[in-house]
Amino acid sequence: MKTTVLTILFALCCIGQLIAVDVPRSEYPRPQFERESWINLNGEWDYTFDFVNTGKEKKYHQATSFDGKIIVPFCPESKLSGVEHKDFINHIWYHRTIDIPQTWDKKQILLNFGAVYYTSEIYIDGKFAGRHFGGSSSFSIDITPYVKPGAQHHLVVKASSDLRSGMQGAGKQSLRVYSAGCNYTRTTGIWQTVWMEAVDYKGLKSAQVLTDIDQSQIVIHPQFYNEGKAMLKVLLKDGKKIVATSEVPASNQTIIVLPVKKAKLWSPASPFLYDLTYQVVDEEGNVIDEVNSYVGMRKVHVEGNKIYLNNKPYYQRLVLDQGFYPDGIWTAPSDEALRKDIELSMEAGFNGARLHQKVFEERYYYWADKLGYITWGEAPSWGMDANSVEVARNFIVEWSELVRRDRNHPSLLIWTPMNEEWWPDRVQYPRFTADLYDLTKSLDPTRPINDASGGVHIKTDIWTMHNYEQDPAKLKEVIYKDGKFFQTPNNIQGAAGRNLGFNDPLITDEYNFPVYDGKMPFLIDEVGGIKWVKDQDKVNAGGSWGYGEAPKSEKEFIERLKGQIRVILELKDQVWGYCYTQLTDVEQEQNGIFYYDRTPKFDLKLIHEIFSQHPEESDK
């Protein structure tokens, strides 16, 4: 018995060493569904490029090493990867060895990827173990049949990307060789944490958590890897105090209802989170799986032309955050960097962010939940042909995975599947967009949907527009004039480009795209974008990019910014929120409140005074 205990302790120490602080991004990547027994696979891997896709013929999947070295989870385009290859990468192969602890015997062994752009194939000792389509969603591969506890194995990952095909969402990755305008350095391959974990065969696979503040209860829909003779015990805690508990059969048909007396609600002003523990218990009373989580009780809904949070009108003062980093591109250099971006935004006076053309990692949402920071979830839809049936097939599958992954986060208020779709056809696009809306509602009926931010709306809960008019007086007239709202220009495929203008559609064909009717919230979710750089000569030489003509002085910048926000707030009866472009500069696009290195451009107290203003009726 003593020998067994020592063996277990030794194995746990080994696991602890594998997740030591010298491993990049060593923190647990999924804080809302956390297990104790896991191994972080970040760090140095081997790699090789495969530009002409002959790697399979060359038996790369059977490799035991490659010549190149790369630091995972940073993409090969980034400085932190140690590679910095900036040109297009169609295919890349990764390799490393993995050691399976003996203590994982008789467990299901899962290989988890935070994200790999875009498609991936997984091999263990040369044997195909699984594949995944989609560059932003997390996925797991059950490698139990391919590994042996106590043994070492070779793990090979092939990642492929074809950005210029139009068949995959690129987000803000440049489709040109170099960054240009509002498109930046690409991300290929592994760009989020890779880890292994051991789970009992009857373990908990997922749990959808719905909070009902009107009836003061939490409803949980659990799913298990395999159903059997086991029970699920759920504990809801406020600190160390157990607030509610339930024990039910471990069945996929089970619905758990936890009454919460005197519930503490989550809001930006008071971001309270309950701790939530799941325990799967076998017939002998042993805990065979335990997952630690948390939940924030809050409600978001649309009523008339306003968005409500916890049954009160809530005005959103958002900033556009594209989630790029100078040294990591799509990958934050540290967990602290994720938190710091949120804190900088709040210091500047914003109460949330529209997370733009990138799926942010789960730890970002964790910090948003903890700090009380509103977010909008968005897919990197730019670069894909939204009129293509194949694109619809690819996108719908990945979008489903994203909604399931992030739907339990209280900070996430709005779903935005697509951005600025301005070139619709009259058949596929309306169907695709409406299907996306219906699919999202079926997966998450609790949140409003912004179907195509600033673009051609088809089926949506809120109406959004983008406009970068720099003159405040003109901006006000552009948004709303003579009782009419501006509609984003739509360029219909197969017809001359026509501006729908104010809400008098000029298209007289059989099918007219919808226009705003005043019966839902109207938000300007891209505005501002005022360019400012330290070096005015760089502006004059065209070395920076932004919207409109750059101000000549700091005073001119501040006055323009004040004016833009003032006129939007004056339209509070028509416009229920805004999103300012943007939080930080990104490469050559230099219109952030902060520089790319996160240093402030102006006195933050002054900036905070501007962006912290709110109209009446708004929850402070």
Named regions from a protein language model:
Residues 1-22:
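Bacterial Sec-dependent N-terminal signal peptides
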Residues 20-82, 158, 162-167, 239:
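Accessory carbohydrate-binding/adhesion or oligomerization-edge regions at the termini
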Residues 31-32, 47-50, 85, 89-203, ...:
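Accessory beta-strand-rich segments of carbohydrate-active enzymes
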Residues 33-57, 116, 182, 186-189, ...:
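Substrate-binding clefts and catalytic carboxylate motifs of secreted carbohydrate-active enzymes
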Residues 118, 123, 132-145, 164-177, ...:
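Active-site mouth of glycoside hydrolases
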Residues 122-124, 217-249, 254-256, 276:
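Beta-strand-rich binding/interaction modules
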Residues 198-227, 614-620:
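Surface beta-strand/loop "capping" patches
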Residues 429, 453-481, 532, 536, ...:
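Substrate-binding cleft/loops of secretory-pathway carbohydrate-active enzymes
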